[in-house]
Amino acid sequence: MLNIIVVLLLLFFSNNVIDSRYISYSKPNYYKTNDKIPVYMNNVRSGLSIFDYYKYPFPKPSTIEYKQSFMSKLAGDLNSTSLYDEVSLHTSVDCIALGKPINYTLDDVNQLKYLIDKHFRINFFIDDLPIGELFKNNRLVEYNNSNSKSSEITSPPSSPSSSSSSSSSPSSSIEEEDDDDTENDHIYLGHPIGFKYNSKYYLYNHLIIIINSTSTKSDKGFYTIKSVNVEPYSCVDCKIDSGIGGVEISPELFDDDKIKQLTIQYTYSIRNHETTTTNSGKSFQSWSIYYVNQFKLSNIDIIMSFIIVLAVSACLAIILLKIFRKTNSKTYTQLSPDDGGWKSIYADVFRSPNNFMTFSIIIGFGVQIVASLFILMVFSVAGLTSIATPGGMAIASILIFSFTGIFNGYSSMRTYIMLGGTRKLYNSVITTTLIPFTILLLMFIGYFQVWSNKFTYGASIGTVFFILAMWLLVCVPCSLLSSYFVRTWPPAEYPVRINPIPRFIPTAKWYQNQYLHMILGGIIPFVIIFTDLSFFLSSWVLGEHYSYSLSFALTFILMIISIVETNMIIEYYQLSLENYNWWWRSLLGPMVTGLYTFIYFIYFGITRIETEGVGFYYFMFSLVFSILVSLFCSSIGFLGNLWFTKKIYSTLHFD
């Protein structure tokens, strides 16, 4: 226990020092002054509603080409050609026309009105870096052309006056800002399409693109792009003077019979911000600004979780001390009436449960999830799943889960043999197919809504075949092989013999109800992972990026400890009531954590998702995720209880 505490403390104090989010193993692109920087359009997004940028009436080239790799398809990125042809390094230009003027009909305006109401944001890439709005200390930074310095506002521009607060003569460069305090800098991905003010709708038709480049003394004229942030404006002829109204696109304008369409010209300007560093490796840290700084909240949550685990550990330590101090030195010929409680059921406690085929299958798949998450956690801490490689987390999850099928077959077969099973071949086949097929089927059903709405992250035919191939050609053989090699191993031994005649179980009182224990036992692990769940949902649903490195590792370890210890305490209480049916309870109790997770997912979806057409997909994903959490917790709870039960009954010595 002391070693675990030392490891947790070391991880906690290094949480703010070492973080995989700063690590990117992809080489940056190098540019010289006036070199063209490629720009690729991506999507229009609000929550889980993600569409192709060119689906809507925005400026588009005559020929649209898509530069997609397999990993970018997994991430849902499109990378299509754009009209941003004048984006160059160290070349500041003003008011460049983005294609030809667009004539908007009433239907087009209603489309844009819907996008504004639902808070859709436009996403694209410059030098493979996602663009976004820059926030410093949770305040939006707005470019101010009158004095070449940045001013700050507390929220994105929401009115013609606030969005047009700059002077009429844009400056050609930006003075270097103080980069020393960048801890709370954050780029919020994408930029809004427009805004609503006094019941009128305005379109952001002008974009200031700010390119932050860096170089070292050894680069000899070569630069890398550190980050790119943008500032949208609603203006006419690039005039973003204070007091000039924006471009109104309210449908009410068409009430005038003379107006049949609205003609709008999109424009953009380029600004460059150059810095010089002495450390050549600093250019690799550009991805840190795309992560939300959650260290303060994570640290508070970790401290609270650590206190909870310490309290549970203290309770368990008292129980173990009581057992081993009073029992381990005794030798029994026959138990006396004073030796009741858990000692009196020693001959029944290892009696095999009902439906132990299903029991072993659940254990096997749960262990596979545990192994997958552990390996994925190691990769995350090592920085191998950085957002610098879109789709990296998805491909890593698929590959790791496929190869950890070896733990599935091994654990299921060992449990099945221990419980006295004889249909070993049947167990091997069902273990490797039943739950994985059910999970894949539920995900496939959920994706019907994604495909019908043509969201960009809808799995392609190639992706579907890849997942099926990894399951059938890698996961299934690994599981079957591991089952085959352990099928002849002798079953694990119990410390006591089993009585052939089952013992009578006393009637329990209302507060000794197993369902009450399950509800209470599932709360502690859920409380520990609650903050990380909220980060995960914000990342997945809202498009924010959060770090899943050391903070996730700490939460992962604390959650496992809490599941094991809470389950041991509940089982000890149950055995003290002379109830030896602990097998299924050790499995079902931790599963309640998955139920709490599902309830929280549904609550998050109801309160945070604004767009239509994603409800069924979100529900199915929440269901699948909660099932995986339940299986993860149940396997850990059972393995902990099995060790605990063997340990305490090994203290009973009989002549």
Swiss-Prot record:
Compositional bias of kind Low complexity: 146-173
A UniProt-annotated Pfam family: EMP70
The record's listing under InterPro entries reads: EMP70 (IPR004240)
Membrane topology recorded in Swiss-Prot or TrEMBL: Multi-pass membrane protein
Superkingdom, according to UniProt? Eukaryota
**GO molecular function terms here?**
transmembrane signaling receptor activity
Keyword Membrane annotated: yes
The UniProt entry's GO CC annotations, sorted and at most eight, read: membrane; plasma membrane
Q: Does the keyword Transmembrane apply?
A: yes
TM region positions: 300-320, 359-379, 387-407, 428-448, 461-481, 518-538, 550-570, 587-607, 619-639
Q: Which residues form the signal peptide?
A: 1-20
Biased region (Acidic residues) positions are 174-183
The text of the family note is:
Belongs to the nonaspanin (TM9SF) (TC 9.A.2) family.
Protein name listed in UniProt: Putative phagocytic receptor 1c
> Source gene?
phg1c
